[in-house]
Amino acid sequence: MQTNGRILVVQPELYATTIGVFENERFLYKQTIQHNEEELSKFTRIMDQVAYRKQTLLHQLDLDGINISKFSAVCGRGGLLQPITGGTYAVNDKMLYDLKTASYGEHVSNLGAVIADSIAKGLNIPAYIVDPPVVDEMQSIARISGIPEIERKSIFHALNHRQAGRLASKRLGKNYNELNLIVIHIARGITIGAHNKGKIIDVTNGLEGEGPFTIDRSGGIPIARFLRYGIDKFDQIEDWEQKLIKQSGLKGYLHTEDPKVIQLNLLKKDPWTMEIMQALAYQIAKEIGSMSTVLHGEVDGIVFTGNVEDDDFVMKEVITRINWIADVMVFPGNNELEAMNEGVLQVIRGEIPVKVYP
């Protein structure tokens, strides 16, 4: 049984690709490759970017003296697949087909497994994904939406949620599988989940309009009023979707999505900016309160992760509203590279079985 591994992890983002190299648990190398928006606009579909992104990251590794022949596995960020349980999955043909055809939606995360597989095949080593955003451990009662034909879906920042939960459990000196936690991931999308003894039994779907509004997403809205608003404005379903997930939130209210501009306006105590940011904090706090009822009020900790350092005003506003529920822990930044490496190491060492999609 292999106990050691040098692992390449690949994290595609909207206008960047972040890569990391690990020797077992040791973080050897990290680089974020920025992609020019104009360059990416040449590609009709997100999946058309695979060769370009692969070439740029391999070129970067070569420039930085990283010998790719030493890798024992490649791990890509998981994408939009059919609902699956958490764990480490080997990349296979069915997974690649679903990602390449956008069978369950088009998103930049779909590139992760495809790029990882392409690199791995050239090196004759395995490719994996870990805890993709479609991890579905929701209890059956949480799936009921109110419309029989529409079931709630689990789409969220599963990888960082789970990693933040594990970090919190270490701080509390307990096993993650023994705790009840509420985890909040703050990024371009915000997702809030109820972690019940290792299972994420309910979570806001940050991609399809649940939870609080975000930088450019609407969050939950009055549906009937939105339908009346859009009936004369939108011709295609894509227009409706664009309004919900790319033209609303802070971008819609403040006409900017630049955190520096927003922070400057907060320092100036601009009344409109302050009101909108207070509303964002209010909505986040309200969802946290909702998740506490999912856990019957038995909450061992409330855990924040993601871009929390960019939202000091919002964080303070949220914490004053929810710190009566449980102790608050904050783990700034994105720990997804470490989480992917950990998931692959566990498989390499035989600590957990590799899962097969679907």
Curated annotation (Swiss-Prot):
Any single GO BP term: acetate metabolic process
Annotated CDD domains: ASKHA_NBD_BK
Enzyme superclass (EC): transferase
Keywords of this entry: ATP-binding, Cytoplasm, Kinase, Nucleotide-binding, Transferase
Reaction(s) catalysed (UniProt annotation): butanoate + ATP = butanoyl phosphate + ADP
Cellular location(s): Cytoplasm
Keyword field contains Cell cycle: no
UniProt GO MF annotations: acetate kinase activity; ATP binding; butyrate kinase activity
EC number: 2.7.2.7
SUPFAM superfamilies attached to this UniProt entry: Actin-like ATPase domain
Cellular component terms (Gene Ontology): cytoplasm
Family: Belongs to the acetokinase family.
HAMAP family recorded: Butyrate_kinase
PANTHER family to which the protein is assigned, alphabetical: ACETATE KINASE, BUTYRATE KINASE 2-RELATED
Alphabetical list of NCBIfam families matching this protein: butyr_kinase, PRK03011.1-5
Name of the protein this chain belongs to: Probable butyrate kinase
Natural source organism: Oceanobacillus iheyensis (strain DSM 14371 / CIP 107618 / JCM 11309 / KCTC 3954 / HTE831)
